[in-house]
From Swiss-Prot:
Binding residue positions for L-aspartate: T123, N127, D128
Signal peptide feature range: none
One example GO MF annotation: argininosuccinate synthase activity
GO CC terms: cytoplasm
Gene: argG
Species of provenance: Buchnera aphidicola subsp. Baizongia pistaciae (strain Bp)
Binding residues for ATP: A12, Y13, S14, G15, G16, L17, D18, T19, S20, A39, G121
UniProt-listed InterPro entries: Arginosuc_syn_C, Arginosuc_syn_N, Arginosuc_synth, Arginosuc_synth_CS, Arginosuc_synth_type_1_subfam, AS_cat/multimer_dom_body, Rossmann-like_a/b/a_fold
Taxonomic superkingdom: Bacteria
Name of the protein described by the UniProt record: Argininosuccinate synthase
Length: 409
């Protein structure tokens, strides 16, 4: 049942087909003032050029655009990168990471403007509805939530286009645009269309940013990345802000076809879905960080980091960014990353990233101890006592088996 006592709503507005239709629909069905909120998280900047005009023409009372690019990469992407989180061992969580900062900024604006409610354009089949609404209720439970896709009678893009035509709202969307895309500074995703048949190979329409690896340059490119406390601080000896570092890595990654994956994943809402993800800069960063972790983290710390990564991936994917569990995982990941300092030299070539040189002042690797040549620092005879103690449980278990067999005779 619709709550008609909502006088002012802040909508997470993208300028696409869905949110363009939501503005007149809310006004018609709730008699509410609609304020369009646009979060600039690094999506195609050309799409933002006329977005205020589009929102106002659709019926919004005002359109507020906030540049969140630096905050998004610094406070959301980089911290999670330290944890090593990869959802189902593949997905760098590009969409899932953007939702909490959008929702938080939307809620902050709603409270500032004394709005009664917030609204999103996520469908009733996807994960984003859960991510947005879990954030909303966790940050401001007093705000009412409007989720049009769970309320209105529209069933297709064609019906939405007809509705916009009826309301005299212009849109660049069409029946032919069959792919669902999400883009921010960290990644771009593509779903739908030919991807819904698992027997179909992704065509060029399924890739938005990156060159096809086979069409990438025939000559490898060497780059350097400097890292401090698990965060990238410089690319090719140029010290830049978090967003600018990523922007630079994205450009070089796009050129070399880095960061493409085609996956089938388990959605939070129960079904499986297929998507093509492109995370060029992120893929380069992950390789650089893993290279330094191999040098710096001891065995138990590395095992603990792997456990953190697994738990963090589910927490983020499932929309629990603002939970105490996520914060405790983040604290652990941040502590582990305090000694992840150093420099990595990487080779980029036709979709591959290879760390060819690496250095850390905190490295636990010692050439003197690890050498296969004659050395004077590691006495191999010391291993005798260690092996006897380490293998003691196995020895006792074997002795017990022998004794039990003897008793059975």
């Amino acid at each position: 049942m619709r709550n008609k006592n909502i006088k002012k709503v802040v909508l997470a507005y993208s300028g696409g087909l869905d949110t363009s239709a939501i503005i007149p629909w809310i006004k018609e069905n709730y008699s509410s003032e609609v304020i369009a909120f646009v979060a600039n998280v690094g999506q195609n900047q050309a799409d933002l050029k006329d977005i205020e005009y589009k929102a106002l023409k659709s019926g919004a009372s005002q359109c507020i655009i906030k540049d969140l690019r630096e905050e998004f990469i610094r406070d959301y992407v980089y911290p999670v990168l330290k944890s090593g989180a990869l959802y189902e061992e593949n997905y760098l969580l590009g969409t899932a990471l953007a939702r909490p900062i959008i929702a938080k900024s939307q809620v902050d604006l709603a409270l500032k403007l004394k709005a009664d409610g917030v609204c999103h354009g996520a469908t009733g089949k996807g994960n984003d509805q859960v991510r947005f609404e879990t954030a909303y209720v966790g940050l401001a439970p007093e705000l009412k939530i409007i989720a049009p896709w769970r309320e209105w009678s529209f069933k297709s893009r064609g019906e939405l286009l007809s509705y916009l035509k009826e309301k005299n709202v212009k849109t660049t969307a069409s029946i032919e645009k069959i792919y669902s895309k999400d883009e921010n500074a960290w990644h771009v995703s593509t779903e739908g269309g030919v991807l819904e048949d698992l027997w179909n190979k992704p065509n060029q329409d399924c890739w938005t940013w990156t060159n096809d690896p086979k069409d990438a340059p025939n000559v490898p490119e060497i780059i350097s990345i400097k890292i401090k406390n698990g965060s990238v601080i410089a690319v090719n000896n140029e010290f830049l802000s978090p967003f600018k570092c990523l922007e630079k890595l994205n450009l070089v990654g796009i050129k070399h076809g880095i960061g493409r994956i085609d996956v089938v994943e388990n959605r939070l809402v129960g079904m499986k879905s297929r998507a093509c993800y492109e995370t060029p800069g992120g893929t380069i960063l992950v390789n650089a960080l893993r290279s330094l972790e191999q040098l710096v983290l001891d065995r138990d710390s590395y095992k603990w980091r792997q456990q953190i990564a697994l738990e963090m991936s589910y927490v983020i994917y499932n929309g629990n960014w603002f939970s105490p569990f996520r914060k405790s995982l983040q604290a652990a990941a941040t502590e582990l990353a305090t000694e992840i300092d150093g420099e990595v030299i990487l080779e980029l070539y036709k979709g591959t990233v290879t760390a060819i040189r690496k250095f850390s002042p905190n490295s636990l690797y010692s050439k003197e101890f690890a050498t296969f040549d004659q050395d004077e620092v590691y006495r191999q005879s010391d291993a005798d006592g260690f092996i006897k103690l380490y293998s003691l449980p196995s020895k006792i278990r074997a002795i017990n088996k022998c004794m039990n067999k003897a008793l059975m005779k």
